[in-house]
Amino acid sequence: MQQNTNVDPQEIAKFERMAETWWDLNGEFKPLHLLNPLRLNYIDQTAGGIFGKKVLDVGCGGGILSESMARIGAIVDGLDMGEEPLEVARLHALETGVSINYVKNTAEAHREDHREYYDVVTCMEMLEHVPDPQSVIQACCDMVKPGGFVFFSTINRNVRSFVETIIGAEYLLKMLPIGTHDHNKFIKPSELIDLVDNTELICKDALGITYNPLTGIFKYTSKVDVNYMIATQKVD
């Protein structure tokens, strides 16, 4: 059963239009392909390894993170509301021989039959694209087992993030299609932690990610002024 109350149709349509290029390493999702090894390593290391664990990837899109987690032995469900990205994800998994269960649904609706079901839940680059981030965070909390980990990543809201992610990445470097992001929907780390604190999740770690346009390389950084991830754990 789908609950569409926490879905922005314009956001869904935006990624539907880009779906065909999801696995083009030099296409519109090149930044995600470059960023993904850092995300995967952070998730795997912080969660104490995800091999053999049940993992839910909320807002999975075309499956970049989902596939990488499945490749290192996780049992992955990928969740998204975009039909085209999910079709791309299913086809790519079939072509590469990776077993992933992709589902078209919201986190809130998926929760109905999956309370405390997953060992790990990931919600990466997704919160800034929904009307109510708190609702998604609560659903993620409800679906992870006590003691399990939930990972979030998003973009800080300040002048630097506006310059780097919108003016730089969208207009100057053409790394992303113009209109991919809305600066007003970016979430400050303090705001995200406040949202997390409203649930049974506890923030265990925060880590920034920086991009060097000259080398084309993403790196970890202690600064969370633009892209950042947080690791949370459900109270046991």
UniProtKB/Swiss-Prot annotation:
The lineage of its organism: Bacteria, Pseudomonadati, Pseudomonadota, Gammaproteobacteria, Alteromonadales. Pathway: Cofactor biosynthesis; ubiquinone biosynthesis. Belongs to the methyltransferase superfamily. UbiG/COQ3 family. This is Ubiquinone biosynthesis O-methyltransferase. PANTHER family: METHYLTRANSFERASE, UBIQUINONE BIOSYNTHESIS O-METHYLTRANSFERASE, MITOCHONDRIAL. NCBIfam families: UbiG (TIGR01983). GO terms for biological process: methylation. HAMAP family: UbiG. GO terms for molecular function: 2-polyprenyl-6-hydroxyphenol methylase activity; 3-demethylubiquinol 3-O-methyltransferase activity; methyltransferase activity; polyprenyldihydroxybenzoate methyltransferase activity. O-methyltransferase that catalyzes the 2 O-methylation steps in the ubiquinone biosynthetic pathway. It catalyses: a 3-demethylubiquinol + S-adenosyl-L-methionine = a ubiquinol + S-adenosyl-L-homocysteine + H(+); a 3-(all-trans-polyprenyl)benzene-1,2-diol + S-adenosyl-L-methionine = a 2-methoxy-6-(all-trans-polyprenyl)phenol + S-adenosyl-L-homocysteine + H(+). S-adenosyl-L-methionine binds at residues 39, 59, 80, 124. The gene is ubiG. It is an enzyme of class 2 (transferase). SUPFAM superfamilies: S-adenosyl-L-methionine-dependent methyltransferases. Pfam families: Methyltransf_23 (PF13489). Its EC number is 2.1.1.222, 2.1.1.64. InterPro entries: SAM-dependent_MTases_sf, UbiG_MeTrfase. It comes from Shewanella oneidensis (strain ATCC 700550 / JCM 31522 / CIP 106686 / LMG 19005 / NCIMB 14063 / MR-1). Keywords: Methyltransferase, S-adenosyl-L-methionine, Transferase, Ubiquinone biosynthesis.
